[in-house]
Every structure is written in C-alpha cells, then in structure tokens.
Regions:
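Short, well-structured alpha-helical segments
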Residues: 37, 41, 62, 102-113
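His-Asp-centered metal-binding catalytic motifs of divalent-metal-dependent phosphohydrolases/nucleases
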Residues: 58-76, 81-85, 109-116
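Short secondary-structure transition/capping motifs
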Residues: 32, 36, 74-81, 101
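Short, amphipathic alpha-helical segments
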Residues: 79, 83, 102, 106, ...
C-alpha cells in the first residue's frame, strides 16, 4: 500500500496504513506542514539509510517516523509533544492497535518522549535503535531553516553525512 502526499506527490510505502489514517484524523496541525507526512517520510528514509549502514532492522523505525510528532499542538513551539506522543503510543499498545516486544516498546517510548532533548547519561540514549531515531529526525532539520549541527547527532555515520 502507498501513501501519497498531495502537496508534493511524494510516495512512500508504509506498513501502518491504518495508523496513518488514525494519526491524520487526530492531527492538530497542518498534515502537509513542516511536521507532517512529508517530514515523516523523510525521517523514515533517514532511518533506513542509517539502519542499513549499521545493519540493523527494527519495527521501531517506521513507528518513530510516524508517531514522534503526531501529538504536536503547534508547528514550532510545543515542548511536550514528544511526551504526548509517548502517551499516545501507550494507548495504541493497550488497545492492540500495534504490538511490540518489551525492548522495542521501551525504545519507541523513549525515542518519542526524548527526541527534542538528550540525556546522554541515560542507558537508552546509547541504544543504537534510539540513536538512529534521534539522528533521523535531526537530519531533517533543514526543512525549518536550520543547518544540521553534528554535535546534536548521536551516530558517527550521521555525523559523516553532515560533513560530506
């Protein structure tokens, strides 16, 4: 199945089509804006690039791409949107709308709740799946007019992409 962005005709295959429809119904900001479907597609593509480099597969990557900004109330000023996204994920899991093992649940909750800040002392910060999620979002910061700052990236490969 494919999701097509009407705004710029981007096409991307996502596994969680029903989830996308649910997110879209509840999305409080512009679905085609800076934190909408086109951004989610780029974040997912970034997760694939990084995870292929590190030879890691995880269900968390697509879910992070779709959910990390899903509970924004404002396009730019919304410091608690990641925490709200984590709460939404817990609801989806309780309702059986998605199923993850314990380790991936912890990774996804942590990555969404903390994607705008980083506690490098937290053990989950050092998890490569979480780091790929963080870097995949941060590599797309150019969409809102900022340059990617390598000091905010967690993986060596993401840092090397910025210096290319």
């Amino acid at each position: 199945m494919k999701i097509i962005s009407k705004k710029d005709d981007l096409m991307k295959e996502f596994k969680y089509i029903e989830l996308i429809e649910q997110i879209k119904k509840e999305f409080k900001i512009d679905y085609y804006g800076d934190h909408g479907i086109s951004h989610w597609q780029r974040v997912y593509e970034n997760t694939q690039k990084l995870s292929n480099y590190y030879k890691i597969e995880s269900e968390v990557f697509e879910l992070f791409a779709l959910l990390h900004d899903s509970k924004r109330h404002d396009e730019y000023e919304d410091r608690y949107h990641g925490v709200r996204a984590a709460g939404y994920i817990q609801k989806l899991l309780r309702n059986g709308d998605m199923v993850l093992n314990k380790e991936d649940t912890e990774r996804l909750l942590y990555a969404c709740a903390n994607h705008t800040k980083s506690d490098k002392e937290d053990p989950l910060f050092n998890d490569i799946v979480v780091q790929i999620c963080f870097d995949s979002d941060r590599l797309d910061i150019g969409r809102v007019g900022y340059d990617v700052d390598p000091s905010y990236l967690a993986t060596k490969y993401a840092k090397s992409l910025v210096s290319e």
